[in-house]
């Protein structure tokens, strides 16, 4: 699995899908999109990087939702290969961390392949027309705790998308 996200393909059109969340509700791009865009995050329960940054992911998701950005997380791993990523464990994690966003299960990995997701977490930020405007990291701290001066790169980029429809280049 790659450890770095590829360069953003600005303007790439989001691929539609329909996936079930941890509450057995089904979601599509249209149902997830906020008035100012959409952030899709490929995450999983077992990844040490996700575990290290999940509190910051939750914070940024709440802050972006307040700006009219829809947010969803997608888990595409095979739970047979990674038992920690089972639906039951997805439900437990979403509840324990009080996810403010749907946590979707991509059982066939078709959505991950369609998006070219290569690592976890992998962030895809779209404008209101569902054109890709951000593909990058959460911040520069990686798995380390974020210090007080660490830029919130994902949040800042998506705030720009919410305000202008365009991400940073």
Where are these regions (language model features)?
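Chalcogenol-based redox active-site neighborhoods
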Residues: 1-163, 167-169
